[in-house]
Amino acid sequence: SNPSQLATAAGARFILQGTILKDPETVKVSTHLTDVANGRQIWAEAYTHPLEAGRLFATQEEIARSVVAAIGSEYGIIARRLSAEARKKPPAELDTYEALLRYYAHQISPSVESIQQCFTALERAAEREPEYGPVWSALATLHCQMYAVDAPGFEESLDTALRFARRGVLREPGSQLGRLILAYASYLADDSESFHEEIETALTLNPNSPYTVGTAGYFHIMRGEFDRGLPLLDRAIAANPCHPNWFHGGYVINYLRQQEYDLALLEVQNHSPYLSYWLPAAFAAILGSVGRIDEAKTYLEQVKEQKPDFGSRAHELFRRTL
């Protein structure tokens, strides 16, 4: 039987194949991924490394990490393909795995529409499988985001986020997502000890997950821990170009810290890393810093339209995001 027939017999949706070629100086690994459902090749890559006896195992590990990040990570080609299929179904009809795919799609590019769809899908999943920890962790993330933007109707969002995040870890102690989200909720709650404990646990569970590494880097930067955060963020973005837009918010903060306002502005323009009124707020702050006052005022008006009490609560609201 050919590999596709074997994959079909085993119930596999995707099959990874490859070849290894070498000469006295180099080794080349060519690999490709096929969707068994239609027989189409959906990803291919070639890796060339010097052929050094002392680095054979290191080379194997480097290639394996690259392949896993490209196809099997939270934002790898498999997750993106399945997520695209799940988007064709109404949120209330998604199964638990599809609900989590919808959650990860929302994390790449959050919007009001996507967060509503996530709430619907994940709440249904929690009703069906209340013992499945990652669903509670994903719901905790949404409540963290509602707290960060001070969304109306979510006055107890931080308490709910902490409760759901702890429930997720209790039900699935080895879940990297669970540990990561408990770190997020702990960060928002100013619990530094819990934040550092959970973020390091998340990284230890799988140090090769681009999403976890990048999120950890982002949180460290938000806490002012740039020496720890920036290398993690750089590593995550280099490993997977399909990373969430909000990762770039870490670079915005770093550029602002260094008073490199033009670079901060480019990050915001190119990646729109903020949700809700925080995007025009970022534009207003940066443009004001470079003397483009009229443009800054225009964005500030957008902030006031979306969040009328922003002026009187700016310090409190900034604390929820920075």
List each model region and its residues.
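Amphipathic alpha-helices of TPR/Sel1-like and other helical repeat/solenoid scaffolds
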Residues: S114-E131, E156-E172, S194-A202
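Short, charge-rich amphipathic alpha-helical segments embedded
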Residues: L122-G153
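Catalytic-center loop of serine/cysteine hydrolases
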Residues: S1-Q117, A121
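Short coil/turn linking the two alpha-helices of tandem helical-hairpin repeats
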Residues: Y103-I115, A140, C144-P152, A189-D190, ...
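Alpha-helical protein-protein interaction modules
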Residues: C118, A165, L182, H196-A216, ...
